Amino acid sequence: MINVLVAGFKGSMGNKTIHMVANNDKFKLAGVYNPVVTEKNVNEVAEFSDLDAPVYTDYEQIPVNDIDVWIDFTIPSAVYQNVKFALENKISVVVGTTGLKDEQIVELKEIAAKNGIGGLIAPNFGISAVLLMQFAKQAAKYMPDVEIIEMHHDNKLDAPSGTAINTAKLIAEVREEHQQGNPEETESLDGARGANYEGMHIHSVRLPGYVAHEQVLFGSKGEALTIRQDSFDRESFMTGVALAVEKIGDYNELMVGLENLL
């Protein structure tokens, strides 16, 4: 039995994760963490009324020796300290929160390696999204002119999405940086061409009704290729989260990307 703590249990992904953990025979919901709530037990929240797990509002309350895996679906401003705390206390981490900076990830990897603890930071837990990133990396070897469009619900706090950034990073591994478009082009409206990552443009859309979607557009002389992925329900991410929780204890390093476990 894997004892799991969920941080960010009141968010959309945290909500789904609580139910996934509670309904998985291999996992035990050992607690939840949120520093700004008043509840003492998850069963005080209507949608979790049939569950029983303590709510921790301070790191000092958490029985670190009784927690095997820390799942984090919080907010960009909180995730670094959460993951640092877990790794320093030799708790494996499964992180879906976006917003970690490259230098923070480097530091967290060092902590994980020092303590021999496994961890996963996944920009996306959807299998289709992982496949999109791998397909895009392969395509970029032959079609290096590329732009990325990511589309999410209008409550998402960060832009571009972690999935889009990771897609760009994977493409950059096989593609030499070069200027796309007309070198003399100008923007009549600031930001019209989107964000720029090593010569690739990334465009972010935020609209109600969307969940998580991405398109990677490749162009070459006389042809074009579009790779698209759609997540219509957050339930689609739970297969990847469960896989990560089950496997992460077998590792002694912090990794980025669900593909490392597949």
From Swiss-Prot:
One of its GO terms (cellular component) is cytosol. The active site is at residues 152, 156. Pathway: Amino-acid biosynthesis; L-lysine biosynthesis via DAP pathway; (S)-tetrahydrodipicolinate from L-aspartate: step 4/4. GO terms for molecular function: 4-hydroxy-tetrahydrodipicolinate reductase; NAD binding; NADP binding; oxidoreductase activity, acting on CH or CH2 groups, NAD or NADP as acceptor. Keywords: Amino-acid biosynthesis, Cytoplasm, Diaminopimelate biosynthesis, Lysine biosynthesis, NAD, NADP, Oxidoreductase. Its EC number is 1.17.1.8. It is found in: Cytoplasm. NAD(+) binds at residues 8-13, 96-98, 122-125. Its main location: cytoplasm. It catalyses: (S)-2,3,4,5-tetrahydrodipicolinate + NAD(+) + H2O = (2S,4S)-4-hydroxy-2,3,4,5-tetrahydrodipicolinate + NADH + H(+); (S)-2,3,4,5-tetrahydrodipicolinate + NADP(+) + H2O = (2S,4S)-4-hydroxy-2,3,4,5-tetrahydrodipicolinate + NADPH + H(+). The keyword NAD applies. PROSITE patterns: DAPB. GO terms for biological process: diaminopimelate biosynthetic process; lysine biosynthetic process via diaminopimelate. CDD domains: DHDPR_N (cd02274). (S)-2,3,4,5-tetrahydrodipicolinate binds at residues 153, 162-163. Catalyzes the conversion of 4-hydroxy-tetrahydrodipicolinate (HTPA) to tetrahydrodipicolinate. Belongs to the DapB family. This is 4-hydroxy-tetrahydrodipicolinate reductase.
